[in-house]
Amino acid sequence: MSNFQFAIPTIDYIRILPEIVLAVFGIVVMMADALIPQNNSKKPLGYLSLIGVLVSLGAIACQARYPGMYDVNNGTGFWGMVHVDSFSLFFHVLIALITAAVLLVSFEYMDVQRMRSGEYYAIILFSALGMMLMTSATELVLIFIALEISSIGSYVLAAMRRRVAESAESSLKYFLLGSFATAFFLYGVALIFGATGSTNVYTIAAALQNMHPLQPIIYLAVALMFIGLGFKVAAAPFHVWTPDVYEGAPSPIVALMSTGPKAAAFAVLLRVLFAMNAPGWFWIVWVSAALSMTIGNIGALVQSNVKRLLAYSSIAHAGYMLVAFAAAKDAGISAAIFYTATYAAMNVGAFAVVSHFANTGEKYVTLEDYAGLGRRSPLLAAILTVFLLSLIGIPVTGGFFAKFYVFTSALQSHLVWLTIIGVINSAVGAYYYLRIIVYMYMRDEREEVPVARMPFGLALALAMCLMFTIYLGVLPTQFINYALKSAQDLVR
């Protein structure tokens, strides 16, 4: 009789330490919620959740310093299902910072909207857990599980404004369409497994290299997986849910779902397309990038609701990121990483301002409501202006170098037409961002719209986003070098 032993090496737990921290704090928050009376403020649970995110950042720092963590041969854990490298650590830190900023914005929002749901904070932590696990998973089944953890949390968070019909409607649309998209991804995984006999990204890559000729089913599998992940990043033509969901969901949650899941899904796309060396992906990405930029910018031109405008803007920016994907070289991958981080900072900041200005019931969300904001609240208007200029790509902001890096990498890969489409769309996009600025500084308000005092949590979140946006616009070299190292770690 053979002696069968089932043991997980200690280092494996270190590889998922940030996720373990978030899971523990999420459970603690739910237990603590049961001890707080229903009608009391749940802000203490928000503070506890923020502590959990900070502890997870400490766990990420421990991962980065752990001996042998980056070793190519021993760099995986849980039998090759999880891999921690510069690439995954970068996205872990990014997701943790996004989550921290959203929690800071949520403190005020929950009180102003009179939402007494303690599970709100726990679900944010569990969603962040799923996003982090997506970025380090090298097993397609584990990626699917992490994707579902993140998605289910997002569906629930979108419906947190329970008494508002638009919120329930947006959540239902998100759930139904998200379920279809996930089914496409899972079917693609099943086809890949049927063709290669594995669901491990690196094992699949080796199998595809030895498969001559490639089975046609491989191309179908890659297309199906791209559909599933394209939905998560709000790339055209899988974008139809975005405006309605962003309009109906709570503004802090829109800040989260427009950046966190997008960053995690882009990380998975990078790992699946490049590390797996998936065939047939180039033209899929090319077409989706062109459609996303064009549909997103044209759709935003006719919007009067700021949340819907930023939703279409999010679709357009997904297109810019996909331009970097199409470039396919180290420079293209690093440009996609750099753009993802820059976009997260400026978009979270923009939605933080929208969340604060919307007031009780999210009443003030139209362009007319922003008229005269420069006189009524000069600081808030100035901060929003910086984020909008960065979204345009004006110099001295992170958005400028992000777009410059993306288009440069595309030209280096001879993607001339895609670059031309991107530049034209950037010029079109400048119109609707400047339109908001014109309303804030050059239009008189039709009625007095109140602007509440900026609370400390919101001020801290805005300061984080503002400093990061300006830092990447003034001193981007160090960050670009790290993005390049992350790209090299991914494809080595």
Swiss-Prot record:
Signal peptide: none annotated. Keywords: Cell inner membrane, Cell membrane, Membrane, NAD, Quinone, Translocase, Transmembrane, Transmembrane helix, Transport, Ubiquinone. It comes from the Bacteria. It is found in: Cell inner membrane. Its EC number is 7.1.1.-. It catalyses: a quinone + NADH + 5 H(+)(in) = a quinol + NAD(+) + 4 H(+)(out). One of its GO terms (molecular function) is NADH:ubiquinone reductase (non-electrogenic) activity. Pfam families: Proton_antipo_M (PF00361). It is an enzyme of class 7 (translocase). It is a multi-pass membrane protein. One of its GO terms (biological process) is ATP synthesis coupled electron transport. Its main location: membrane. The chain crosses the membrane at residues 16-36, 44-64, 87-107, 118-138, 140-160, 175-195, 216-236, 250-270, 282-302, 309-329, 333-353, 381-401, 416-438, 455-475. InterPro entries: NADH-Q_OxRdtase_suN/2, ND/Mrp_TM. One of its GO terms (cellular component) is plasma membrane. The keyword Transmembrane helix applies. Belongs to the complex I subunit 2 family. NDH-1 is composed of 14 different subunits. Subunits NuoA, H, J, K, L, M, N constitute the membrane sector of the complex. NDH-1 shuttles electrons from NADH, via FMN and iron-sulfur (Fe-S) centers, to quinones in the respiratory chain. The immediate electron acceptor for the enzyme in this species is believed to be ubiquinone. Couples the redox reaction to proton translocation (for every two electrons transferred, four hydrogen ions are translocated across the cytoplasmic membrane), and thus conserves the redox energy in a proton gradient. This is NADH-quinone oxidoreductase subunit N 2. It comes from Koribacter versatilis (strain Ellin345).
